[in-house]
Every structure is written in structure tokens, then in C-alpha cells.
């Protein structure tokens, strides 16, 4: 086995690990929703979508036996992580600067109209407001933890893309 094959195998293993972590984070969100009754807001649901996209792209990337396929799916996973960073940062901002919502979030109809909200309403249906701040976990709010998780997902993906940019075959 040459060095390139060993590196590809390691890369694929790391993608599986990343996917499992993202699925565990969504599982944690569902635990908070159903057992601690912390209703998800539109930005929470969008963050779930981004975690699931990262997991899907990482699992698919781990199935490829060539650098070209792995790199393509790493790019898609990194873009999903960037989308998650933007969404989580917006959520942190909204909670730090609450406005007047009248009990309605403008994103709710959009998020609830997406097909997964109809297929799996228990996972993707909006039930809360983005301004609602739940008790912090280890000193950070849920949007802050989500932001940390997206950054932690993005950094290794970006480093991998830079480190392996010459591997095409």
C-alpha cells in the first residue's frame, strides 16, 4: 500500500467520524426538544439542516475511492459548515439583541414549507421563537455551542482541502 492510498483511507475515516459527530449533534438537539421541552426555532431547524448536510456529504465522501470524489464532497461539506456558521452567528446575534417578535418569527413559514418539515415534522417543524433563550449549557447558549461545532467542523475540512489540493486522481 502506497502513501497516497493510506492518506486517502485516513481521510475517509475522518469523514465518517465527522458525519457521526454531526448526527450525534442533531440527536442531542432532538433530546433537548423532546425531553427538556426546548422548542426549536427557525434558525435551530436551519442549523439542523446544515448539520445533516455535512453528515450526508461526509458519508458520501467516505464512499469514494478517489481523491477527486473525496475533495468534491469535502468542498460541499465545508460550504455547508460555512452556511451553518452564518446561521449560528445570526442566531447568537438575535439572542443577544432581541427585538419585538409579537410571538411570530418571519422565517417560520419558509422553514415549515420545506419538504422535510412535511416528511418528518417532529424533526423539522418550527415550534419556538429565535429570541427565546434557554438555560446555558456549560456557560454557552445552544446557538453558541452550535457556532463552535460548525467552526470545529469547518476548520479540518478547510485544512484537508488545502493540504490535499494537489491530489486529483
From Swiss-Prot:
Query: What kind of membrane protein is this, topologically?
Result: Multi-pass membrane protein
Q: Which InterPro entries match?
A: DiS_bond_form_DsbB/BdbC, Disulphide_bond_form_DsbB, DsbB, DsbB-like_sf
Cell compartments where the protein resides: Cell inner membrane
CC per GO annotation:
plasma membrane
Gene Ontology process terms (BP) = protein folding
- UniProt record similarity statement: Belongs to the DsbB family.
Under what name is this protein listed?
A: Disulfide bond formation protein B
Q: Which organism is it from?
A: Paraburkholderia xenovorans (strain LB400)
Amino acid at each position: 500500500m502506497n502513501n497516497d492510498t493510506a492518506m486517502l483511507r485516513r481521510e475517509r475515516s475522518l469523514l465518517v467520524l465527522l458525519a457521526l459527530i454531526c448526527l450525534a449533534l442533531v440527536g442531542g438537539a432532538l433530546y433537548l426538544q423532546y425531553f427538556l421541552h426546548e422548542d426549536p426555532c427557525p434558525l435551530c431547524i436551519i442549523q439542523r439542516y446544515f448539520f445533516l448536510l455535512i453528515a450526508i456529504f461526509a458519508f458520501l465522501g467516505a464512499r469514494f475511492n478517489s481523491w477527486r470524489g473525496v475533495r468534491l464532497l469535502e468542498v460541499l461539506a465545508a460550504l455547508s459548515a460555512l452556511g451553518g456558521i452564518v446561521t449560528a452567528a445570526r442566531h447568537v446575534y438575535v439572542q443577544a439583541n432581541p427585538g419585538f417578535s409579537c410571538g411570530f418569527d418571519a422565517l417560520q413559514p419558509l422553514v415549515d414549507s420545506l419538504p422535510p418539515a412535511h416528511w418528518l415534522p417532529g424533526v423539522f417543524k418550527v415550534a419556538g421563537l429565535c429570541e427565546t433563550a434557554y438555560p446555558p449549557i456549560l456557560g454557552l447558549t445552544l446557538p453558541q455551542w452550535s457556532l463552535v461545532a460548525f467552526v470545529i467542523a469547518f476548520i479540518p475540512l478547510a485544512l484537508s482541502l488545502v493540504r490535499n489540493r494537489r491530489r486529483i486522481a
